[in-house]
């Protein structure tokens, strides 16, 4: 008997992007599970990780000449600005607002990955882009990476 095929709506079959998406969802789950005392710190961790992840994607788009980068980067900026506002909301004790933001963020993120990031992943695969190599070019195999 064969194992059933599993569908992961956040998988783009590009390991470095898939790992980033998985980490984002893990941090978002921590926000969801955080009690009121720890919510602000969990949200701050999510915002910091997201800022770094968006910066990486923005750099990849610029470095590879991705045609749709402007719209993609605008989405990153707008969402990150709203997320940063959540830090202020948490500091002011509006924790329910932060929890609602987390709930809405999950929905947006799934759509963003399935549309914007899926198109970017297709572009990066076409360019044979690998951030471990510092950009475009042949991907380093795990054997070659281990020897380096």
Task: Indicate residue ranges for each PLM-predicted region.
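Small-residue-biased structural context
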Residues: 1-148
């Amino acid at each position: 008997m064969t194992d059933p095929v599993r569908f992961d709506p956040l998988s783009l079959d590009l390991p470095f992007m898939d790992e980033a998406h998985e980490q984002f969802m893990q941090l978002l789950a921590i926000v969801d599970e955080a009690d009121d005392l720890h919510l602000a710190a969990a949200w701050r961790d999510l915002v910091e990780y997201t800022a770094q992840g968006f910066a990486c994607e923005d750099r990849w788009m610029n470095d590879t000449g991705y045609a749709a980068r402007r719209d993609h980067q605008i989405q990153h900026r707008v969402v990150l600005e709203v997320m940063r506002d959540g830090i202020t909301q948490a500091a002011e004790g509006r924790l329910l607002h932060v929890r609602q933001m987390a709930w809405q963020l999950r929905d947006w993120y799934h759509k963003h990955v399935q549309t914007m990031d899926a198109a970017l992943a297709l572009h990066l695969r076409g360019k044979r882009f690998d951030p471990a190599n510092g950009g475009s070019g042949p991907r380093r195999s795990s054997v070659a990476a281990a020897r380096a």
